[in-house]
């Protein structure tokens, strides 16, 4: 482990020096790549340096105990040694996690698709609740949110809503949200007071950059049509809505949120790139996925991952058996406890798998 940490520290210093090189500064692409690499190494190096400092302090404390000390001073040194040893253990555990293979998509922006599934109008209303929850979560994390496509219903729900979240580490925080979300509550329209169960599906895709997924004009077909509002009525007499079809894969994306055809096309292409990136990544990982499923659920939108129970004010994440009795605050975007536990679970499972393969 420590050989790897020394190599990481050496690379960090090399990258830091390169970022001061005038040739690098003048090359925007190279500068961006190196800045990203420096950022990805920084926490590991900072933690490793603190670890080395703590080890040095432990050696000094042990050396002091070999000297002639009065009882009070000896107790002080022993107390400090105990604290330093505990800190050393914490740092070792943290370094093991920091050296785990990183998800290359973690720092990417994301595109999120929410669809009302089983439950009709109630499912569409729940899709709107989830969208609001993610909006609040985005605000708390200083992520920029942009709606790319929406199909609202007459009663304030969404058959489907697609949006992007932009900001550092957006995918690392949102990637565990893919799957089926179940709600149990009494609908406002229910006179008998019976609890209904509905579901909405969420799909989280890392947003692909142009250089990662190239979309050739010859591979796409663009159709234009009049945009429609809730209930399907036409709200626009000009053909500003756009449908982009990727001919080789058959993947289709529609966008009608903007007033101009050009803006709708740009948004549709962003979603298409993300879907193509996901499509190609799944193809590449097909063999590996057959033997090693995702450590925190499959990420399949049909897999039930979480239940939101209104009568009990309860949120349960079924993948890790976590239950919180504070539904209202979670729906207000206070999702950190859920997400942190999912991340911790994934890291624990990764450590186990690495220990078995070592």
From Swiss-Prot:
Primary residence: cytoplasm
Modification after translation (UniProt): Methylated by PrmC. Methylation increases the termination efficiency of RF1.
Residue numbers of N5-methylglutamine PTMs: 233
InterPro entries named in the record: PCRF, Pep_chain_release_fac_I, Pep_chain_release_fac_I_sf, Prokaryotic/Mito_RF, RF-1
Subcellular compartments: Cytoplasm
GO molecular function, one term: translation release factor activity, codon specific
Segments passing through the bilayer: none
NCBIfam families, alphabetized: prfA, PRK00591.1
Described purpose of this protein according to its UniProt entry: Peptide chain release factor 1 directs the termination of translation in response to the peptide chain termination codons UAG and UAA.
Protein name: Peptide chain release factor 1
Species of origin: Brevibacillus brevis (strain 47 / JCM 6285 / NBRC 100599)
